[in-house]
UniProtKB/Swiss-Prot annotation:
It comes from Bacillus subtilis (strain 168). Heme b 1 binds at residues 42, 108, 111, 211, 221. Heme b 2 binds at residues 91, 94, 196. This is Menaquinol:cytochrome c reductase cytochrome b subunit. It comes from the Bacteria. It is found in: Cell membrane. Heme c binds at residues 43, 216, 220. This cytochrome b is similar to other bacterial and plant chloroplast cytochrome b6 proteins in binding one of three hemes with a single thioether bond. The keyword Transmembrane helix applies. It is a multi-pass membrane protein. The chain crosses the membrane at residues 37-57, 96-116, 126-146, 195-215.
Length: 224
């Protein structure tokens, strides 16, 4: 049954060459841990992507119960944590995954830097990778406010004060994020939710697509 459906689609769209090109792509020997023990350092990028996928899936689950409103945000998180089946586990995965993905990205960045993989002709991919790092930090920052408890509120105020310290445009950046130059309230929560769920993920998907395309085009850099 499934084979017939696949054959029907393949006959019209010729999808076999596309997925075979991905599935049959040969992995260079120097990045295969089976041949070189030190090759495990090349796994940090893939592990970062794996944790990112977990973050996306767990985040989609959380948005089904979360209410981005100052009257209901904390209650919705409490309900998710204590009443929803597997809610505590999924939220824990998302919470710890947010820290783990930063750690993995940091290790991946160190590997690229110390092995000189950012040099010609991969300078543009290095820039894209740095942008991905900043987007990830932004996701962590905006997500921290969403439970709307005292710890999140005070941490967000500190973060907004840091943004306000930006030369020339600091006040505008703070107002853009908070929705008000002086008050951290309903508009702040709504904006952080929108940035966390829509704007930054859209930027992340676009940058990651560019990152992978350039890796496929240029190949994985060799060892020092």
């Amino acid at each position: 049954m499934l084979n017939k459906i696949y054959d029907w689609v393949d006959e019209r769209l010729d999808i076999t060459p596309m997925w075979r090109d991905i599935a049959d792509h040969e992995v260079p020997e120097h990045v295969n841990p089976a041949h070189h023990f030190s090759a495990f350092v090349y796994c940090f990028g893939g592990l970062t992507f794996f944790v990112t996928v977990i973050q996306v899936l767990s985040g989609m689950f959380l948005t089904m119960y979360y209410v981005p409103d100052i009257k209901n945000a904390w209650e919705s998180v409490y309900y998710l944590q204590n009443e929803v089946a597997f809610g505590q586990i999924v939220r824990g995965m998302h919470h710890w995954g947010a820290s783990l993905v930063i750690v993995m990205m940091f290790l991946h960045t160190l590997r690229v830097f110390f092995q000189g993989a950012y040099k010609k002709p991969r300078e543009l991919n290095w820039i894209v990778g740095v942008l991905i790092f900043f987007v990830m930090l932004g996701l962590g920052f905006t997500g921290y406010l969403l439970p709307w408890d005292m710890k999140a509120l005070f941490a967000t105020k500190v973060g907004l004060q840091i943004a306000e310290a930006t030369p020339l445009i600091g006040t505008q950046v703070k107002t853009l994020l908070a929705g008000h130059p002086d008050i951290v309230g309903a508009q702040t929560l709504t904006r952080f939710f929108a940035i966390h769920v829509f704007f930054l993920p859209a930027a992340l998907f676009g940058l990651m697509a560019a990152h992978f395309i350039m890796i496929r085009k240029q190949g994985i850099s060799g060892p020092l």
